[in-house]
Amino acid sequence: MPQGLSEGVKSLTKENIMKKVILTGDRPTGRLHVGHYVGSLKERVRLQNTGEYDEIFIMIADAQALTDNADNPEKVRQNILQVALDYLACGLDPNKVHIFIQSMVPQLTELSFYYQNLVTVSRLQRNPTVKSEIQMRNFEASIPVGFFCYPISQAADITAFKATTVPAGEDQKPMIEQCCEIVHKFNSVYGETLVEPEIVLPQNAACLRLPGIDGKAKMSKSLGNCIYLSEEPEDIEKKVKSMFTDPNHLRVQDPGKVEGNPVFIYLDAFCRPEHFAEFWPEYQNLDEVKAHYQRGGLGDMKVKKFLNSVMQAELEPIRTRRVGAAPARGGRDPEGGQRLRRKDRCRHAGRGAQGHAHRLLRER
């Protein structure tokens, strides 16, 4: 590690230590789904609109996406546009936040290289998120080095912008803990220079992690058990109807189990009091529905019909905004990506992000 790095980082941190900064983002491996929405996107929009933060950086993590998609870079490239559209559709405003593409900030790779010298292989192996992701992708026998080290890359992303806050889902807690360990190790060697981030979880406990519609523990694009934010209404309805429920609730009159039932987990995440007056006036609130289901006499299809109405009401404005933000097909802009990036200042934000990261590394 070059000796000058410490002094450059130290002077920069002293100037901006009081700033409140958010860093968060997503991998462009596909369109974003409702798990992303309730797990982090809604919280990002809320934080954006509070005015409590000096700067908010939202990163489309294309370089990180290549760690397990190296044989399909075109998939990553194409989905940069899809993720950007989903951001705009959910209400993220480029006038209030910096939406940028990770690969446009090469300083992040440099910082990640330095951090690799502060982390052991055994520590990465103990990271529960890394372990579960390796198992899910069947990487046990042959783990790509880039994928194995992605907690270090995430730490570089966070600390490069001196982020004080990272809105994320429950599954990202081990990643933030490891980032804090890197910060402590770096600061112990080079002085108090880096900022330790804090994770902000969704305010609604039901939103910490939505299960897949098949009842699996995690909604995942790779498992095909998602409801995408851009789904057409008829596709949402089909997926809701096919959702896993209590396997022992075979007849309407049978008592049903609410705990761990994906249909009720989704209702906890999406349902609001006004939905009952509009879609199910027979009940006053969700507790009444749960009680009826538990004592028997309420069928799964009725509950799913209500859930479909609730989700359609939530996703329809998102879908409409997405259509409005999407580039026109055909004509002079066949791929759409360049026009969208210009329109939403992704390139400008990328240069701004470069500047922030470059200042961290300029005196090396």
Where are the regions that the model predicts?
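Conserved nucleotide- and phosphate/pyrophosphate-binding catalytic cores
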Residues: 174, 180-364
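A short secondary-structure junction signal
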Residues: 126-127, 163, 191, 222
